[in-house]
Amino acid sequence: YTIRLSEDEEKAIEFISKKLASGKRIHELELLKRTLQYHHGIIGSLQKHLSEKYQCEMDEHCTENVVNMMTNEFPTSAAKKTYAQCVFLKKEQDDYGISDSYEKMLQNPEFCAILEELVDFGISRYKVNYSYHYQDTNLVLYQKYTYEDACRLLNWERNEVPLNIGGYKYDKKTKTFPIFINYDKQDNISDTTKYEDHFVAENRLIAISKSGRSMDSEDVQNFLKATERGIDVQLFVRKNKDDKISKEFYYLGRVIATGNAKQFVMP
């Protein structure tokens, strides 16, 4: 017995497997599950369902991010080609329905069976590993996340390539400021990027800005004045940058500046 999927169907299954089935967020999984029954009013019914079943509220940033994930608008322009076929939703008046291409996929019972099994697997992983959220975030303390996971779960409109993040990045729209630290520094990196980020206690960290910054730089000020500016600073740490397998960071929660900042020149 051979299961036959079209090229588009295979790509959709690959996308769900690679991007969503880890269960790091419930939203897209429950959305896909609902599309097996409902073809219209998808986002409105999803918001209601998540609120009732998971006590999970979708604000405007979250809604936009989920829609972008499901319409191939979240990836960077270079990455859009990879899953060009993976557009699951289309705009309908003040909500979304399923896209014509996805509706065609759903006419294949074999595709539907694989999709449902994959989505149920993702939902079970979410419940076991990712449902115990830290405060009001979509993140779980001490779980591992990639750069892309962080951009998605902080509800950014678009993904950012790691090179553009380079240690930290402020997203104006969501007012989130993730910091990514490589804790195990290598000897062969340039002196200007050999930042001396290190923990001085289990809840205190010395973190160095990007090179070429002063106390007056906008990114430095956003960090130092995060509380008064309403900026949400989140910390992600990985032990070794050469971790070729996962390239994931441990999520360590929110951080605030102590007010003891010093300016210095790298040797």
Q: What is each residue range found by the language model?
A:
Residues 3, 56, 76, 85, ...:
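Intrinsically disordered, low-complexity regions enriched in small/polar residues
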Residues 1-139:
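C-terminal helical accessory/scaffold domains
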Residues 25-34, 141-248:
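Acidic, glycine-rich low-complexity segments with interspersed aromatic residues
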Residues 242-267:
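Compact mixed alphabeta submodule
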Residues 25, 43, 99, 124, ...:
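Compositionally biased, intrinsically disordered low-complexity regions
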Residues 46, 50, 179-181, 235, ...:
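Generic structural hydrophobic/aromatic packing signal, biased to beta-strands
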Residues 13, 209, 262-266:
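A generic structural motif
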